[in-house]
């Protein structure tokens, strides 16, 4: 049976893990929110507000190759139509539906409702010493008949580079949050 796990611990506060089985690819990153005192400090409340904005599809958080439109919304759940590179990832060309659920003030779970199964979990991780980490985990089902790897999908769409890894995306989103905090927008 195929099971590959690769763990990287960047510091005692951060970790990156990738696990692959024949059917699943799981990437997880836990990135320290306030690694030093020289940059704007981000509070748990600001992180929570940012998770909500990201989950709603706020364009400041969404990569340029993703298009999203809210079609249903309640306090704890949002359903959006999603296009990648201006196109559907589904064989019939219809927009993929994405459901985002909020669990309390520190966890956001997003999954695609058709086509190859994909789930992302973003959240706030509190360490025993009070430090905050931004957590992002992605799970892809590779054995779905319509599955295409993210890099192959980007190449097919004509993108000049592959989409970010889970760790790169976590750091990208955290950088956006820090910028919004510095500008007083969170």
Located regions from the model:
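Residue-level recognition of well-ordered beta-strand positions that form the cores
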Residues: 30-32, 83, 138-140
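Glycine-rich portal/gate segments that line the openings of hydrophobic small-molecule binding cavities
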Residues: 70-116
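Intrinsically disordered, low-complexity coil segments
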Residues: 17-20, 34-38, 86-104, 126-132, ...
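Short, highly charged C-terminal tails/helix-capping segments
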Residues: 68, 171-186
